[in-house]
């Protein structure tokens, strides 16, 4: 479907309330055009030292991404709940003993297993067509609850402990959220910013040997590693929106073991730009890339089209923020029960899913979603205790080798670069790379009109879809100044020189380091290079341009050159491109001599 890009939206409305003898009373109405401005509007109402704590629904995506939802929440639906906290105690809480689960009938699923598998196939077709790289689809289970949601949360805390768990209940609104989340979206403190995305999953083993085998299988699984690499590149990009150039790094890479599952987890850190704070960071990162996909803007629109309903609080965030300092901590609400109260009692909603890539097996994705939801469904009483029995284990962390290695530029270039942003989730990684070499970078909207480019050089950025959707990219491909096209930009250059763009006959490749064979006439020196690819479409045929690098088969053009115009069908900025920064260095060196 079509991604509807819009920056002209209805404002989000917030109601400030005070608690009185008659209950909660509205004292002020706040209207804001995005999440950041809504939080800043709370400053006059927030004493120094106090924080706001609560939950943000995923559907606030309407005010963090430039899209219009086709299936928005109903008018007046609760999108966020925040309480002003003046003081708090830190203490050890003893979880009360919880009775055995009460079996409850009446659970319903939003999709049958067959329907779920067909959606996976449909997403893979979109990946093949070059519309996106990866998408996280959620399947929903709903049913009545015969226990208070707080009891279910205590059961989860006992049976499925997780580091970013939390419980929220707004009795007057009839909403309760019981989150047993292992994932942090964002932490900001004293000018530092951190996120720790999770992607890649295996169950726990029934014994230490099986546990080790499953962990090793996870670490060496091509699909899981590619998906995780893609997510790390995405989150580096999102942190790059608010961080100082050169400060964003992958600081940790581990397998983390929780009660029933093992995950690949990376920690990505950065230093906030002097003009940015934790509110800006939340605006940039929300919702988390691990539960949307890539490129984020396009997949958020695609999720809306495929799931055909609001997500509500699932994959939103629970946490707190100091609106004066910007210090904050937010989780991602996966492994979360959303409960709503009505005269008939509590009704529960549980959602689970996974990231769909070109290498996803539909039946395996269905099975993964089912066992991810099993612990919550069992805690709600919707599954028999013996159903979908999963091995359990102690929490553990197993460090892995970091792919991203530090890079210190040997040369700086006093160049003014125009960067054309084509709605990709890696754009800011490229911008940071250029700035790390001393360049000034002006960012131009690839979906905007053709504008004059009076710069020393231009970099046409990657993005979903075909390059023809960006008239500015096609225009820049013909300029008589140094040009570097990356992925979509590379394709724009090839089309401009008479080549055709087709679906790759060897299939899509996303997040996978690939061997690139160069003849030495382009930006790469002669020989073999390892670079990460994110492409489904490929240039084909003869054109008025030289192919300077191919894939290992010698069939697919990976690098092209026409004078001072260069195109690369790989991503030099990725953590999976060990010497990718040298590509930028060589281009800038040549541009500085023009």
Region spans (language model):
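Extended alpha-helical targeting/anchoring segments
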Residues: 1-409
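Gly/Ser/Thr-rich beta-alpha loop segments that engage phosphate groups in nucleotides
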Residues: 56, 132, 291, 295, ...
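Short glycine-/acidic-enriched loop or helix-start segments at secondary-structure transitions
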Residues: 62-63, 144-145, 241, 324, ...
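Short, glycine/acidic-enriched loop or turn micro-motifs at the edges of active sites
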Residues: 236, 424-425, 574
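Short beta->alpha connector loops at strand-helix junctions that form conserved
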Residues: 251-252, 445, 461, 503-506
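Short, hydrophobic alpha-helical segments
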Residues: 377-380, 384, 496-497, 587-594
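Amide-donor transfer/coupling interface in amidating biosynthetic enzymes
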Residues: 404-418, 448-454, 468-484, 502-594
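Flexible gly/pro-rich beta->alpha loop and the following alpha-helix that scaffold active-site loops
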Residues: 416-420, 424-486, 491, 497
């Amino acid at each position: 479907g079509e991604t509807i890009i819009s920056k002209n939206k209805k404002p989000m409305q917030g109601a400030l309330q005070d608690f009185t003898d008659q209950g909660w009373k509205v004292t002020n109405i706040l209207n804001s055009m995005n999440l950041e401005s809504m939080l800043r509007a709370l400053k006059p109402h927030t004493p120094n030292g106090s924080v706001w704590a609560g939950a943000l629904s995923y559907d606030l995506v309407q005010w963090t991404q430039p899209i219009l939802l086709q299936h928005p929440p109903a008018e007046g639906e609760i999108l966020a709940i925040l309480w002003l906290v003046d003081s708090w105690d830190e203490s050890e809480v003893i979880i009360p003993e919880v009775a055995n689960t009460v079996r409850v009938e009446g659970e319903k699923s939003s999709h049958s297993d067959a329907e779920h598998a067909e959606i996976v196939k449909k997403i893979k077709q979109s990946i093949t067509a070059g519309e996106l790289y990866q998408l996280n689809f959620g399947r929903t289970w709903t049913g009545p609850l015969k226990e208070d949601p707080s009891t279910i949360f205590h059961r989860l805390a006992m049976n499925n402990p997780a580091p970013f768990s939390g419980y929220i209940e707004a009795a007057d609104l009839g909403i309760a959220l019981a989150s047993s989340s292992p994932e942090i979206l964002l932490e900001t403190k004293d000018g530092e910013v951190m996120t720790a995305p999770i992607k890649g999953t295996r169950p726990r083993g029934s014994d230490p040997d099986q546990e080790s085998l499953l962990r090793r299988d996870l670490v060496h699984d091509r699909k899981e590693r590619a998906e995780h690499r893609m997510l790390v590149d995405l989150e580096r990009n999102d942190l790059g929106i608010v961080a100082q150039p050169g400060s964003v790094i992958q600081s940790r890479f581990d397998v983390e073991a929780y009660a029933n599952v093992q995950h690949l987890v990376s920690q990505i850190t950065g230093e906030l730009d002097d003009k940015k704070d934790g509110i800006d960071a939340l605006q940039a990162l929300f919702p988390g890339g691990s539960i949307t996909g890539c490129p984020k803007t396009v997949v958020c629109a695609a999720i809306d089209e495929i799931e055909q309903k609001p997500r509500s609080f699932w994959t939103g965030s629970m946490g707190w923020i100091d609106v004066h300092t910007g210090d904050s901590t937010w989780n991602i609400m996966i492994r979360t029960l959303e409960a709503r109260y009505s005269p008939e009692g509590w009704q529960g909603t549980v959602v689970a899913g996974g990231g769909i890539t070109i290498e996803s097996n539909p039946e395996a994705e269905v099975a993964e979603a089912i066992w991810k939801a099993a612990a919550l469904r069992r805690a709600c009483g919707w599954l028999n205790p013996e159903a979908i029995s999963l091995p359990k284990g102690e929490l553990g962390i197993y460090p892995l080798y970091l792919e991203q290695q530090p890079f210190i530029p040997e040369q700086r270039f006093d160049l003014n670069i125009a960067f054309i942003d084509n709605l990709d989730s890696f754009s800011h990684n490229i911008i940071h790379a250029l700035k790390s070499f001393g360049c000034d970078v002006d960012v131009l909207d690839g979906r905007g009109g053709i504008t004059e480019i009076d710069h020393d050089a231009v970099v046409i950025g990657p993005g979903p879809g075909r390059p023809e959707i960006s008239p500015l990219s096609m225009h820049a491909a013909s300029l008589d100044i140094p040009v570097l096209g990356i992925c979509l930009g590379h394709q724009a250059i090839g089309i401009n020189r008479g080549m055709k763009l087709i679906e790759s006959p060897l299939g899509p490749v996303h997040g996978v380091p690939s061997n690139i064979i160069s003849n030495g006439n382009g930006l790469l020196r002669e020989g073999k290079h390892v670079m990460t690819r994110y492409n489904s479409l490929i240039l084909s045929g003869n054109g008025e341009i030289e192919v300077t690098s191919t894939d290992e088969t010698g069939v697919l053009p990976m690098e092209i050159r026409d004078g001072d115009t260069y195109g690369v069908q790989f991503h030099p900025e990725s953590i999976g491109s060990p010497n990718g920064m040298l590509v930028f260095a060589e281009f800038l060196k040549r541009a500085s001599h023009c």
